[in-house]
Amino acid sequence: MKISARNQLKGKVVSIENGSVNAIVHIDIGGGNVLSSTVSLAAVKELNLEVGKEAYAIIKATSVMVGVE
């Protein structure tokens, strides 16, 4: 896989929350850290995402969002 993004974190999908159009995919990247990303339901299907599957969280500096609770 060749991509321009330099921040690539390998992990395992721990849960997928399906909505009507999008899904929130939670990836355990180790060290007690879970990264969450909103993707389309079409992407979930195309990538065959399912709990337990290895996946990469790919982060481009121009696409980072920050939130607080």
Curated annotation (Swiss-Prot):
Keywords: Molybdenum. It comes from the Bacteria. PROSITE patterns: MOP (PS51866). Transmembrane segments: none annotated. Residues 2-68 form the Mop domain. GO terms for biological process: molybdate ion transport. Binds one mole of molybdenum per mole of protein and contains a pterin. To C.pasteurianum MOP proteins. This is Probable molybdenum-pterin-binding protein. It comes from Haemophilus influenzae (strain ATCC 51907 / DSM 11121 / KW20 / Rd).
